[in-house]
Amino acid sequence: MLDLTPTELERYRRQMMLPGFDEDAQRRLKSFTALVTGVGGLGGTAALYLAVAGIGKLILVRGGELRLDDMNRQVLMTHDTVGQPRVFKAKETLEKINPDVEVEAVFDYITPDNVDHLVRSTDITLDCAHNFAERDLLNEACVRYRKPMVEAAMDGMEAYLTTILPGQTGCLTCLFPEKPEWDRRGFAVVGAVSGTLACLAALEAIKLITGFEKPLVSELLTMNLGRLEFAKRRIYRDPHCPVCGNHAPWRQHVSRSLESQLRDLDVDRIFNLSRPI
């Protein structure tokens, strides 16, 4: 693992006071790359808290320009960037907040053409995409390459969160075999709601990477933040799931080259840090 500089030791001193969160945990954070999609009120805020916690590298993925009605929940943006690509301003802001974190900005949406490369370039994914088309692509790629994915979504005052470990838990398609209706521009949102969920998503990633607390594995956390009601329910892997099931198409058509790449992935380094329930 990478060593910590004197500046980093001082910067992260307060979180290293937590039981189980020692210098080794901090070095693990520094050695990890996280892919964050969306880079809005959810993804942008999650990226912020990963950056200040000391993640080694962030890959931010979001196409499109910033709109004025986005600004009620944007913590990385300023008014003068309305009409410009949000992902570059997010990179600039994060690098100013913590210059020790490497930030890569990808001005694009998640597509079939880029998803494999992006997922293979990272250790963990935070799925904060704004529609199920992108979420499904991320889910399939994370399962294919056995990369952990923190899944977070909200609409109005309601939100859900879970952590997906391919090979150990169900995937997003197990959870939502039929996709809910999702209006990408029409959903209601209060910035404090997306921000609350984003903080929990970032914390899930930090727990999974460092192992200092048990992550939300094989459970779905649902929240109604208007009434402050929280519930957990067990989720299961569907053996007939078309994405992660025993007979998923990618299992039957994987090439020898890809099989070799999968064996070379340092999956155990990630999975052994979690303690599945």
UniProtKB/Swiss-Prot annotation:
Recorded hits in CDD domains, A to Z, give: ThiF_MoeB_HesA_family (cd00757)
Whether Cell inner membrane counts among this entry's keywords is no
Q: Which domain of life is it from?
A: Bacteria
- Respond yes or no to whether keyword Transport is given for this record: no
Q: Which SUPFAM superfamilies match?
A: Activating enzymes of the ubiquitin-like proteins (SSF69572)
Q: Name one GO biological process term.
A: nitrogen fixation
Q: Keyword annotations for this protein?
A: Nitrogen fixation
Family per record: Belongs to the HesA/MoeB/ThiF family.
Q: What is the recorded name of this protein?
A: Protein HesA
Q: Which organism is it from?
A: Leptolyngbya boryana (Plectonema boryanum)
Gene that specifies this protein? hesA
